[in-house]
Amino acid sequence: MAKIALPRKFFGRRTEILEPPYLLSIPKNSFENFVQLKVNPYKRKNVGLEHIFRTSFPFKDPDENFILEYLGYEIGDWECNRCGYKPKDDLLGGWDVDCPECGAKLVYKEKFTPEECKLKGLTYSAPLRVMLQLKAKTKNGYRTFPPRKVYFGEVPLMTDNGSFIINGTERIIINQLIRSSGVFFDEKEEKQKDATITRILYRASIIPDKGSRVEFELSGATDLISARIDRKKLSAISVLRAFGLETAYDILKPFYEGVRKYIVKDKYLYDAETGEEFTPEDLEHHYIFAILKFKAKIAGFGTSKEREIIEERYIEEWEELVRILDDERIEVLSVTSVPRENVIKSPYGKSLVDTLATDTSPRDADRRSPVKVPAEYTLRDYGLMEMYKKLRHIEALTMEIDSIIERARVYFNVFFRDLKRYDLSRVGRVKINAKVHNIPKVLKPTDIDLLDNLPPLALAEDYGEYKAGTRITKELLKELFKNYKEIKVKDYTEDEARFLLPIDLINILKYLIDLRHGRVKKDDIAHLGNRRVRSVGELLENQARLGIAKMEKVFRDRSATIHPEQPDLKPQDFINPRYVTNAIADFLKTGQLSQYLDNTNPLSELTHKRRLSALGPGGLTRESAKFEIRDVHPSHYGRICPIETPEGQNIGLVTSPTVYARVNEYGFLITPYRKVENGRVTDKIEWLAAYEEENYVIAQSTPTDEEGRIKAEFVLARHKNDIRLVKPEQVDYIDVSPRQVISPSSSLIPFLEHDDANRALMGSNMQRQAVPLIFTQAPLVGTGMEKKIARDSHAVVVAKRGGVVEEVDGSKIIVRVNPEEINLEDPLDIGIDIYELRKFERTNQKTCVNQRPIVKKGERVEKGQIIADGHSTDRGELALGKDVLVAFMPWRGYNFEDAIVISERLVKEDVYTSIHIEELEVEARETKVGDEEITRQIPGVPERALAHLDEHGIVRVGTYVKPGDILVGKVTPKGETRLTPEEKLLQAIFGEKTKDVKDASLRCPPGVEGIVIDVQVFTRKGGKAAKDMLAQKVEREELEALERELEKKKNLLMSGVEKVLKGLILGKKTDKDVKIGKKEIKKGTEITEEIFKEYSQYILARPENFFTDEELIKKIREIYTRSRTQIDMLQKVYQEKKETLLKRRDLPPGVITLVKVFIANKRKIKVGDKMAGRHGNKGVISVVLPVEDMPFLPDGTPVDIVLNPLGVPSRMNVGQILETHLGWAAKELGKKIGEMIEKGRDRKAITEYLKEIYAVGDENGENAKFIEEFLNSLSEEEFWSVVRDYAQRGIPMATPAFEGADEKAVKELLKKAGLPESGKTTLYDGRTGEPFDFEVTVGYMHMLKLIHMVDDKIHARATGPYSLVTQQPLGGRAQFGGQRLGEMEVWALEAHGAAYTLQEMLTVKSDDVEGRSKVYEAIVKGKYTYTPGIPESFKVLVRELKGLSLNVKCMNGEEKPCDQVEIKEEEEK
């Protein structure tokens, strides 16, 4: 049986209503949406790359001589496995595409696997080919060229575990958390001339995804509304007119009751809707606006000719209207009025009317309103003109008004009605709709007229032939209401819905006025409803869009130089296709959000891939981010972890999504809740974004009865960022799980609820720094999340399909797949799954990845079962540290200030030993003076220094190397020198120069020692390298490995075929006499094992010679045909790989050979290493004590670690104490089971005892029932194996966050284990044997060894490299630098009067170049005197002064320039 993880005793609910989603879904789904690799290229959704290409093409040049249209794209090389067909220019290869030749599905051909890319320093990518069609203008229309696939370059692909491999290193793209597009309302203090008065300015900002930012401002001082576009101030009314709210009637109607529009006939007013007659006097106490038409001159015409103009004018009194009606020169087109009383009573007050009145009031002496425009135009044109003049700084007198209006129309259409320039995006539309439009979820027949006052809507579900997402019109609704009583609707987010609409502006102004009157609150920038996640796909999409914009520019430029009548034009003639892929590749290599993957252990890898950052392009900066944005916000609940964030300047800006958080289609974080109906909790799950949950009452996870009713009379619930007690009937939703609030890292901390948040933060961060150990051990006290994290981080190997383990060793597992799971369509599926295990691989942090199988040969495995452990995992569970026996007590001052005392047992038994792998590489390059060479012949190096190198000069695997040892011998040509006659003679005889070379070997750097575990040699194929012995050796080894792989697969295939054949014919009798060579099988002979073994190949090839049963013969023939096809396919794949291997050039230009050497270093735990628990309890080892000196328990067991008890009270992380108690109980209960086995207890007694343990603290009896079912399902052998595991390891516990074990349960378990309920015991001093005065808390705690190891920190320099300019020693361990002697250190030496020491420090030990060499010579000769010279930094200072044209001379008798003079000390007289 496989080594399975023992089932944990759960203190929370064993079964969750909803399991946490796949933890890497955010980046992986985002990237899949970007490339849509697993979608048929002809059926791709309009997202990601497809969306960019569709919206950017067709390209047109200004004269429209050429049009370049987009037809589709393919990623990767595709081929038919059956007939070998490769797609031509007219077919896009891709998922689910049929081969036109034979009808089979095309298959993706991977050039290199991610593992090969890591080894060879390549980028894991696939070619992107875009199918484009060119059209060229001719006299008779357009000439269409056949479509062509254009190679756009390589697109980096995401590996299965969510990372990218760029030039051999694993990198990831961080998810960015940025402000979303949409409308935002805020308020700030308005500057007043009188500093004592403060007034508030209310602002509505409409932020699009791309394009100009439109803002409306309502002044608290004047109550007038103004607008800004890209920060430039202009009239709000002009902006409303430009967007389609043309007249006073259009603007005022949505805001006030009683707004009427009148038509004028014979000086009487008639209501435009009802036809009712009014006189001007009836409009007393009304606001009156009139549209007039008359002849006048308009400034800026350039001619004095009068034109008919129309103007809109505010008329203060009705008498003024009478005068205008009486004036025969003026034609009144329409009048709009609104009663003053209605305005005052209206919730929207006078703001809008006053703004409109101010804008249209007569201002000049001629009593003319400024709002006027020639009669052939409209008032909207006036708005467009005003907007254009302000934004483009056009003066009215400089241009004809007609041309200004024409340009203004074009300007508006380009900048506000073209998706390339202005796009609210789907997110922006959804946000605006949610904020200012009250959109019903369901429309009824009475709601048809509502459509006029709503933004565009779409069907939320399929209704007959009308699919979900179809745009709703009145006609469509009328049609649907014939068959349906109500229609579910959602936001429509395409086409004009992505522009700013008049209805948006009306509702935004309504909301702004509501904000002014305190009816609504301003927006909170930190609220997650206003912030969204830009994941990998979207970030790459933005880069690709920039590349396409450059490409379009090139298209325009090139099309100007090509004649449309030219024959044989190709898309490549017009574009530079690399822009798109180059933009993506550059972003992955150097982008702010592209980071070097932190894969110290599986948890750090998982967390890094899920990380959210508010920094990066378009985001915040560390300096500008205020406290509010960094702080925990109520909307983070269930979405962002309140605990896990870095300490330091990034605190609160870099965060982690919670266990259950997902991202919705608009990029907002969503979290699941269970629906509550009338106080009864249902199993219906709904995922809500932060902006959706505002209106609901949401309770935390609360106990319920059998019917699902909430037990408590009052429950704690959240509503609109407020927490309060409510009755169960008021609750709308309830949390899915108590773990919903925290991230995977935090969810691994047991008793999290008993830790102070600051320490929990350190605990969750330090778990990510735990080093994978050689021997792993899952924690005794866990939280139940260990398995989920191990699986989702891809550290363990999971069976892809069910089957039987055919073969297993340390490096691979071979599973013969269940027949029903074999894909018969794919000839390459031979029914065998081979899992290559990762062996001693180096991570980015130099830790070691090593996978170990946990299944045995012949064992049956199910799909999804864990079949191999990885680094830091144990039986499929995350195992970051070890459970060790700890005691909380001071020990002779050695654990002062968080220091840790450890036992020598941890060193001797390799408890905390880890492997670290150093990778060193050397290149042999082509140089101008000749080629570098990897060789054993190194000038000036004695033979003993080369003893560990092979014949090619490369270190042998298994050698123990120390700093300074040669790893790879390399020589470099020195350059051309004049040859002596002897050398010329030798050259003439042997035709080769005598080598004039210098040693450039790769040596083991300081601080690195260990065993060489692997050497990899890469040589360039072809050219000079082909003659090289080393290159031939490497090629031979690679080909042999390929052949071995082919043979292995053939053998596995044939053994599978034989098994199937055996099942068909074993025991059957032959129907004919068969003669094979000299041997003969008689008719009626039964086919036994021996006969089958000898003749199976003959039966397979010619079944008709043995049998007459047609059905049987047909089956055997099918088996034979399929096996032959598969062998042919395997041979073909081998051939392809061989060809690739023989012709490829993997190395960068100029490199002949690349050698990588991997050195493994086994590090035992030692003084100076950092250790930590899971509760933020960290410390540095101060002493390693012999086992006999450690304090010991009454039974003689010495403790492993002594921690300082003073580290607990002030830190308030009591969780560590509870973990210690529970860990002790768990271990001792295991020992009790061991005693029962020794006493020979039967299976039933042990099962009952385990049930008792598992029942502790379990109200529902779930645990006892579970363990009973589990143990009963095991065979006798499996049962005793599991029980022995319990005895050896202890009873594993799981105490999930916020529903963990309580004090009562811990005490009960301690009691059952026969331990004191206080968790304390008497300890004895290992040195004296005396008991300590007080009882001490003792128990098992999961302690981690962190990556901050003393071996990486300690550093000492004697001599080493110097800076080029100042000649001072370099700084830092990496540069093998020295210690800085700063100003304060100089003062100290001065204060002590240590003049000679100081002189030494400032001269010969630093940058006195001549003095340094003189000191060396003196020491060699045994003299210890020296003469200091001028420090180089002084000379640098002098040269810098000369650079400022200041000549400095030294006045010591010789007036030489300072950087040449020698300062001589006066000789002693």
Swiss-Prot record:
Please give the CDD domains that the UniProt record associates with this protein. Answer: RNA_pol_B_RPB2
Q: List the InterPro entries hit by this protein, alphabetically.
A: DNA-dir_RNA_pol_bsu_ext_1_sf, DNA-dir_RNA_pol_bsu_external_1, DNA-dir_RNA_pol_su2, DNA-dir_RNAP_su2_dom, DNA-dir_RNAP_su2_hyb_sf, RNA_pol_bsu_bac, RNA_pol_bsu_CS, RNA_pol_bsu_protrusion
User: Which keywords describe this protein according to UniProt?
Assistant: DNA-directed RNA polymerase, Nucleotidyltransferase, Transcription, Transferase
Q: Which GO terms describe its molecular function?
A: DNA binding; DNA-directed RNA polymerase activity; ribonucleoside binding
Q: Which GO terms describe its cellular component?
A: DNA-directed RNA polymerase complex
State its Enzyme Commission number(s). 2.7.7.6
Q: Which GO terms describe its biological process?
A: DNA-templated transcription
**EC top class named in words:** transferase
Which PROSITE patterns does UniProt cross-reference here?
Answer: RNA_POL_BETA
* Any matching Pfam family: RNA_pol_Rpb2_1
Catalytic reaction(s) noted: RNA(n) + a ribonucleoside 5'-triphosphate = RNA(n+1) + diphosphate
Q: How does it assemble?
A: The RNAP catalytic core consists of 2 alpha, 1 beta, 1 beta' and 1 omega subunit. When a sigma factor is associated with the core the holoenzyme is formed, which can initiate transcription.
Quote the function comment for this protein. DNA-dependent RNA polymerase catalyzes the transcription of DNA into RNA using the four ribonucleoside triphosphates as substrates.
Q: Into which family does the record put it?
A: Belongs to the RNA polymerase beta chain family.
Please state what the protein is called: DNA-directed RNA polymerase subunit beta
Which organism is this entry from? Answer: Aquifex pyrophilus
Lineage, highest ranks first:
Bacteria, Pseudomonadati, Aquificota, Aquificia, Aquificales
Coding gene?
Answer: rpoB
